[in-house]
Regions:
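Acidic-residue sensor for enzyme active/binding pockets
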Residues: 51, 147, 255
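Acidic/histidine-rich catalytic cores and adjacent linkers
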Residues: 56-58, 66-70, 77, 85, ...
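Short, positively charged, Gly/Tyr-enriched micro-motifs
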Residues: 1-58, 99, 111, 241-242
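Short, surface-exposed amphipathic charged segments that create phosphate/polyanion-binding patches used
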Residues: 62, 137-148
Length: 297
């Protein structure tokens, strides 16, 4: 365990110890399961849910994260509605009733939404703003690509339109100013993109709803197809988007956790089943207490 803590892949640990990797996994899994049994999740009220793949193009696992403690409390196979049931059942086994979870943060996945409303009916959903902005940026880039078909000079300027303006170099800033003047549709799309992000600074829900209503009206007037599609998505997920201005929760914490999940993939290289991978996630992201020999705090 001490060697694995030093960011060493399990296969390398087995090589150093002169044992079969499966023996290392057996010992590793024993201590993870023991720590899981005593893991205290009694204070959780705000839950984040996100999925990641165990390998590129392979099986998915869903992470349940305590957003206040910034740690993974449960991992299960799959990425659909049933994963929310799995998380709920884990919490209930730990003595946490479903109504203790008052806030849920997730992407706009229909299966996650179905799971949340079924298994955590008392929780208010906040759709992760970073996922919403990702969809907005995809709409912006779709407009650029459509314009690029007739204007080659727009090639290579994806991030000129996606980055925050203050983060552009002087050269890119000049190019942006020129392009939004030369191409009115692109300029209007960029204006709408920048304007949308004012939503996150609204003081309360009524203000957010009024702002978003006006923004959707402007999109309708602009008649830019990609933005009309995005606005349709916004309307379909309205309450969970505007709820951000009250909850201020995101899955941003999961970005840091996901970097550790990538590390888990490297350390678990050669794992024979998804159970080993899941336990490596607990080890790196669960902030659990272990009492194995030579464990240092």
């Amino acid at each position: 365990m001490a060697l694995i803590e030093r960011e060493m892949p399990v296969n390398r640990v087995a090589e150093i110890l002169g044992v079969n990797p499966q023996r290392v996994w057996t010992v590793f899994n024993h201590w993870i399961e023991k720590a899981r049994q005593s893991d205290d999740v009694s204070t959780i009220t705000r839950l984040g849910v996100d999925e990641t793949s165990s390998k590129k193009g392979h099986k998915y696992v869903t992470l349940g994260v305590d957003l206040d403690a910034s740690r993974v409390i449960h991992v299960c196979e799959g990425k659909g509605k049933a994963t929310l049931k799995n998380i709920k059942e884990h919490l209930e086994k730990k003595g946490v009733p479903e109504d203790q979870v008052t806030q849920l943060s997730m992407d706009l996945s229909a299966s996650f939404i179905a799971g949340a409303t079924t298994y955590f009916p008392d929780a208010e959903i906040t759709f992760d703003r970073f996922h919403v902005v990702k969809l907005l940026n995809e709409a912006m880039d779709k407009v650029r690509k459509d314009e690029r078909k007739e204007h080659d000079e727009l090639k290579g300027h994806k991030y000129t339109f996606l980055k925050n303006r203050q983060n552009l170099s002087d050269k890119k800033e000049k190019s942006l100013a020129e392009m939004i003047q030369l191409y009115p549709t692109l300029g209007e799309a960029y204006r709408l993109k920048v304007l949308f992000n004012d939503l996150w600074e609204m003081p309360d829900k009524p203000a957010a709803c009024a702002f978003l209503t006006e923004w959707c009206n402007e999109v309708e007037a602009a008649k830019i197809s990609a933005f009309m599609t995005f606005a349709k998505t916004v309307k379909a997920h309205w309450s969970g988007i505007v709820h951000f201005v009250e909850s201020h929760i995101t899955n941003g914490i999961l970005e840091g956790i996901n970097s550790k999940v990538q590390l888990a993939k490297r350390r678990a290289r050669g794992y024979r089943n998804i159970h080993n991978f899941i336990n490596m996630i607990y080890f790196l992201c669960g902030k659990m207490k272990f009492d194995y020999p030579l464990y240092f705090t």
